[in-house]
């Protein structure tokens, strides 16, 4: 984790640029995050927080942090920017309740293809989720943001949790 911090400290300009990016999503992350975490995917329009989340064929979300005001109506669009079909490189968005174990959830859901990789035994840990989409597809869901706090979101497609979570 600390390996990503020394590089920006060696160069003045990137450090200042990074600082500007960190100010955009108001509260700071408790742990260092990859550069893509700086991508602001939330746009508040009136009473609705619009979230534009992207996933690709490299098993990456375009961010690993989403900040929305507690209780705000959320309209989240997951867009698969890759080309591979859902059967081989499908992605979904699953927002788990506070305290839920993302790894355990993903492991339990690996065989739940018919329910978009959300197993019946762990469905009660989900706040909101999308269906699985393939390359070039997108899906939009609406839900109310939970109480203030930190929540795990992930792609539960088999093998994706390790690199597709935030």
Functional labels for PLM-detected ranges:
Residues 32-35, 128-166:
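Extracellular/periplasmic metallocenter environments
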Residues 43-74:
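N-terminal edge beta-strand
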Residues 100-147:
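Extracytoplasmic beta-sandwich strand-turn segments characteristic of Greek-key/jelly-roll folds
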Residues 82-86:
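Extended, low-complexity, turn-rich repeat/linker tracts enriched in Gly/Pro/Ser/Thr and Asp/Glu
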Residues 1-11, 21:
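Bacterial lipoprotein signal-peptidase II cleavage site
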Residues 78-80:
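Asparagine-centered strand-capping/turn motif at beta-strand->loop junctions
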Residues 93-103, 161:
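Short edge-strand/loop segments of extracellular domains
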Residues 17-54:
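N-terminal low-complexity, Pro/Thr/Ser-rich intrinsically disordered segments
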């Amino acid at each position: 984790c600390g390996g990503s911090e020394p590089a920006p400290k060696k160069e003045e300009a990137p450090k200042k640029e990074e600082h500007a990016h960190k100010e955009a999503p108001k509260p700071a992350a408790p742990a260092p995050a990859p550069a893509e975490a700086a991508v602001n995917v939330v746009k508040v329009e009136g009473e609705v927080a619009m979230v534009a989340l992207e996933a690709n064929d490299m098993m990456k979300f375009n961010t690993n942090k989403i900040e929305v005001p507690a209780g705000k109506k959320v309209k989240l669009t997951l867009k698969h920017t890759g080309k591979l079909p859902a059967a081989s490189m499908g992605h979904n968005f699953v927002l788990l309740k506070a305290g839920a174990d993302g790894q355990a959830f993903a492991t339990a859901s690996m065989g739940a293809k018919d329910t978009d990789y959300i197993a019946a035994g762990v469905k009660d840990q989900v706040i909101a989720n999308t269906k699985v989409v393939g390359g070039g597809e997108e899906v939009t869901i609406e839900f109310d943001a939970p109480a203030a706090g930190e929540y795990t979101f992930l792609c539960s497609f088999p093998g994706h949790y390790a690199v597709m979570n935030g």
